[in-house]
Amino acid sequence: MTGFATSAAAQDSTQTLQQALKQIPQVVLSAPAAMQVFFLDVQAWRSLEKAGPSADGMRRLSIAQPIRPLESIGFGLEPWSANAKVPFDEVSYFAGFGQAPSNISYWGLKDKKAVGTLVASLKQGDFAAVDGDAPGLIANDGEGKMNMQKANQKDPWRGMMGKASFVLPLDTALIQASSATGMKILAQPAPSVADSEVVAASLAGLKEGVPADRGRIVQAAVISPIMGLAAVDPAKVLLSTNGDADIAKQNLKAAVEANGRGIPPYFSGVLADAQINNLPAVVISLAYADCATAKQAVDGVSAAWKESMAGAKDAKVAGTTVQAGKLCAAVVRVTAPKAENAGNPVLAEVMNRYMRREFTVLQIGAAR
């Protein structure tokens, strides 16, 4: 196990991710899901292939897949851009949370002016102002409506089922939802996901794991302890926004005893797809109460990776701990030996196992 070579540059590779998380209300972190927030840095992903996405580049988008506007990019970025009323390459990031059909998506643009321009373009089409709790809300149909005559697989505002979109400008982003419900909460995201102490600790670790002078975060997911507790009731282990950390610790301890071998229970984490020194990598950063526990997690994740991830056995595994305020992050980076295309074989192995419920690297349990 080796740590990371530290970079003299004080840049921050998590800047765009933090910008996205600042727009999302912290209440999202109480959702009983393993992956609570999804994120794609459009500019980082597009930098992998200047000519346009290949099949490998498209397949790489396994973390960001649930974000609604990305459902329409498989038919090419040009038709997507024409229907979206904004060039794909002018989008800074996409983010989202929740499950279809009630999932919420965020379109991050370069500034407020770009947001105003896009809203004006949408109003020239079939979007119009609608009444709601949040001023500035526009929609292209009634709540829950599907208009098959307007269905268009290449249109991120409609999709193949012609679903309605409700859109709200928020600072330098647009929120896209399938109804006006909850827009009042979304319009005032403070305290945000980025304001969460445990998420901030995970981001501090991620910043170390992806050096800004040599690497970029392509996609990321904010993960909860549910990722490592396949057999445990999610509601019992989540630290709600006004939750009691001591009760959460007790519940986690009980869950650990029921779950078998694994790493110490973490509060929150980030699973990131990155490109570092032109090589695809996966970086995992988990928030802990102290660095002694975080060190156990680094060792445990590294050992579990070598033990269970046969499909990525040639990958280089490195880890470290990062003090983050009162908390400490356990950071493990797994880098592919070479970049054969625009894909990420390490991420593919992680997501394939995750989908089959066989991703045990983050399993919470008694020390290995």
Per-region residue spans from a language model:
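Sec/Tat signal peptide C-region and signal peptidase I cleavage site
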Residues: 4-10
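Soluble, non-membrane globular domain cores that form compact, hydrophobic packing
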Residues: 11-102, 108-368
